[in-house]
Amino acid sequence: MATDTAAPAAMKVDGSALAGRALAAAGARHMFGVVGIPVTSLASRAAAAGVRFLAFRNEQSAGYAAAAYGFLTGSPGLLLTVSGPGCVHGLAGLSHATANAWPLLMVSGSCSQPDAGRGDFQELDQIAATKPFIKIAVKATTIADIPRLVFQALAATVSGRPGGCYLDIPSDVLHQTLTESEAAALIDAAAADSAKSDSSPPKHKSLDEGIEKAAELLRRAERPLVVFGKGAAYSRAEDAIWKLVDTTGIPFLPTPMGKGVVPDTHPLSATAARSLAIGQCDVALVVGARLNWLLHFGEPPKWSKDVKFILVDVCEEEIELRKPHVGIVGDAKRVVELINREIKDQPFCLAPSHPWVEAITKKARDNVLKMEAQLAKDVVPFNFLTPLRIIRDAILAEGNPAPVVVSEGANTMDVGRAVLVQNEPRTRLDAGTWGTMGVGLGFCVAAAVAEPDRLVVAVEGDSGFGFSAMEVETLVRYQLPVVVIVFNNNGVYGGDRRSPDEITGPYKDDPAPTSFVPAAGYHKMMEAFGGKGYLVETPDELKSALSESFRARKPAVINVIIDPYAGAESGRMQHKN
């Protein structure tokens, strides 16, 4: 009998296998993408090395999944694409991650180096294509480059302000080989070099002074406010911020994806008194949230012209751009811990009877009562409020761990933000800084694999759902515990709302630009792949569908028929349209 006498050290390892092993050695656990030339083998080899590969139907959705994974875990999300158009499709997720300051590494195959510039298959200068959206772009020109660049690029995604990075591996490099011993040595060397590098941001020279000034400003303020965003959620600052709120009695306001860092049900929540809180506060501690359009740029008339901002951000450029009264460069969790320590030396606490606290809590209570009065009505055909109330109650009934809620759409997301309750951090994913539509089902997959003990509930407008609807097959293929609820109001913002005098011109018989096929059977898409579909038009039907699907924890689509005239065009962004 013939035997293979070759020593293990002499066995060959190609570039795909080396990349997979390097990713695993660097701590990667999940990768999202679409396979094809030249990266199919890379996906398989990475899986063999311990990196679970989640195969999508579209690189955009895979990219959004990788971005959300970075936010949820604090570790880089991995996106794998083919060359050329696959790389271009991946730019959606890559840019979304960078815009939201989430760590993501996109790995793409590219054309063979000897054929570059000659019109090779799917040829594109992918380094140039990705550069506007990333922190760094690196290219492996030989197989020996791969481990070092994997570790380098992954580290760059999380250093300083998190964001997207890009690794380009040409097809000829993926096919190059070296021995097992050479591969192991390269990975060991890359790991050792990475361990020597301190990726944590250096202590800023003005940190101590900034902490002292922040504590003193809060102590002297008559109407202080704590504002926190998804940056605080990303840094796991919830314990520190909750302690700050409880020990000082300062009201707080979360941005949409900051919801849950401190429970929405906390008595000092100013969410339902937002206009009063930002309009009258005299000192605002802003943690992990940028003073961009979401916070009205920190300017009048929404904010008082005399407000003093204490801005905490990991990015020094953000501080320099906004020019706050006090700017502190640093990790949100660490900075708030230091503020707590400083306050402990000279403690203060606003009592519930403090005029500012009383004004906030009274306004919030009054607005909540008004909202609850509207929510208590069972309106059929459905408006947005009735089904959202039923969904809210079903989600809250799940208890702990709370489901991750994915919210996408115009009216669906806007109204849902006011109705749905988050009591745990990182349990709300939405369109984010860019207001990106198309993130929904990619986010669902990311949440399901990043938080396997949680149910995932997507509350989607029918337009938002349409961007990634084919990924229902992905949900079924991996049997993920995701329930997708589609608010079906026949179009973008609603059905055909045109008045007769608007229906003119040579194409007047065409559907309105905002309208879809009425009462489309979105639930049947899920059924086509073996999942569970529900069509609901009444409160009892919705309650039954939610109860059954939540209990099953299997892929499901609940198609909720909404009055096409409910809601408003452009949601709450009419002034931008």
Swiss-Prot record:
Q: Which reaction does it catalyse?
A: an (R)-2-hydroxy-long-chain-fatty acyl-CoA = a long-chain fatty aldehyde + formyl-CoA; a 2-hydroxy-3-methyl fatty acyl-CoA = a 2-methyl-branched fatty aldehyde + formyl-CoA
Q: Where does thiamine diphosphate bind?
A: 59
Q: Which domain of life is it from?
A: Eukaryota
Q: Where is it found, in Gene Ontology cellular component terms?
A: peroxisome
Transmembrane annotation, as ranges? none
How would you classify this enzyme at the top EC level? lyase
Q: Which cofactor does it need?
A: Mg(2+); thiamine diphosphate
Q: What is its EC number?
A: 4.1.2.63
Recorded hits in InterPro entries, A to Z, give: DHS-like_NAD/FAD-binding_dom, HACL1-like, THDP-binding, Thiamin_PyroP_enz_cen_dom, Thiamin_PyroP_enz_TPP-bd_dom, TPP-bd_CS, TPP_enzyme_TPP-bd
Keyword field: Lyase, Magnesium, Metal-binding, Thiamine pyrophosphate
For this chain's record, the cofactor binding note is:
Binds 1 Mg(2+) ion per subunit. Binds 1 thiamine pyrophosphate per subunit.
- Please give the residue ranges the record annotates as the region Thiamine pyrophosphate binding: 412-493
The residues listed in the UniProt record as binding Mg(2+), with positions renumbered to this chain, are 462, 489
Q: Which family does it belong to?
A: Belongs to the TPP enzyme family.
Q: How does it assemble?
A: Homotetramer.
Q: So what does this one do?
A: Catalyzes a carbon-carbon cleavage reaction; cleaves a 2-hydroxy-3-methylacyl-CoA into formyl-CoA and a 2-methyl-branched fatty aldehyde.
Protein name according to UniProt: 2-hydroxyacyl-CoA lyase
